[in-house]
Amino acid sequence: MAKKVVAVIKLALNAGKANPAPPVGPALGQHGVNIMMFCKEYNAKTADQAGMVIPVEISVFEDRSFTFVLKTPPASVLIRKAAKVEKGSNEPNKKKVGSITKAQLQEIAQTKLPDLNANDIDAAMKIVAGTAKNMGITVKD
């Protein structure tokens, strides 16, 4: 018989740097999950992606065991990295802070495709381009 899921916890953590301090500790502790075990497993799976923010979806079962699924990094993080900017514009319509090429846009869309609500790469590129526009980053040909 399948185990019953008690809670689903969503967190966005730095790859390879999960520790029991907030936000991890309180989120998992209230469901009785072994926090150190989660941190070790998460850090082991994300060690190769250091410096990125990797969202994780943790399913907690009634016997306090857990499983987790790693998602792709947020589009905004990938766009900032490609454009080599620290943060997006606070006035995206007026002040542009950087630009990315179509090739970079396609690469980001390809990375995000499994987590996006898009059927093909063109639709994914439009979604990512919209995110870039809202950050004050232009897409050049």
From Swiss-Prot:
It comes from the Bacteria. The keyword Cytoplasm does not apply. Keywords: Methylation, Ribonucleoprotein, Ribosomal protein, RNA-binding, rRNA-binding. One of its GO terms (biological process) is translation. GO terms for molecular function: large ribosomal subunit rRNA binding; structural constituent of ribosome. CDD domains: Ribosomal_L11. NCBIfam families: L11_bact. This is Large ribosomal subunit protein uL11. The gene is rplK.
